[in-house]
Amino acid sequence: MTKHDHGLKEKVEGAIDKVKGEVKEVVGKVTDNKKLQAEGKWDKVKGTAKDTVGNVKEKVHEYKEHK
């Protein structure tokens, strides 16, 4: 991704982290692995945070363009 991706990089990374977290959490539940479940929940939180950062960057860029 380029320097001027306007939050796209964070959005993609966030989506990947959320999917990865969901998989870990489900596998952790099926295998009764509490550590894996916790890692999955943490990955989903990280993904949501990255997605939020991406959205903010996008909005800032839009604001600057229409200023």
From Swiss-Prot:
It holds the Pfam family CsbD. It comes from the Bacteria. PANTHER family: UPF0337 PROTEIN YJBJ. Belongs to the UPF0337 (CsbD) family. This is UPF0337 protein BCE_3655. It comes from Bacillus cereus (strain ATCC 10987 / NRS 248). The lineage of its organism: Bacteria, Bacillati, Bacillota, Bacilli, Bacillales.
